[in-house]
Amino acid sequence: MPEDEIIERAREDEREGKLPSTQAGEFVRDEMEHIREGEHGARSPQQAIAIGLSKARRAGVKLPPPKRGKASTRTRKQAKRDLAKGRKGRGKKPSRKRSRATKRALKREGRSAASRKALSRQARSAARRRSAASRSRAAKKAARTRKKRG
């Protein structure tokens, strides 16, 4: 379960009118921090990001599932499930056996998924997949919604 301060930071982003992807970024950043601190590992930066996005959706961030063709059917279905979980609020307590199994599986993975080199490679490949217009639009919005200094 994500810490309360992460959820609070995401809520603050929402109040400031930032996109759900920015709100979800708080959870992804937190996940990277967990890997760096050695709490658990991840097979790749993509897996670490996916875990963060899943936690964000379950915490109530209104991040829509990826569009058809952008991600696998399984990923899209899981994102839909996470979103529904986030809308419904916490149901029954998660199974202890499952939680321990996932935790142990992640503990066996390496820590290099959150290294500067791996994240830089991931960021570059993600940027390459976007059009110039999309990148420009995002930069303009970032400048518009950036916190004012002072």
Label each residue range with its predicted role.
Residues 1-150:
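A charge-rich, low-complexity, intrinsically flexible signal that marks solvent-exposed coils, linkers
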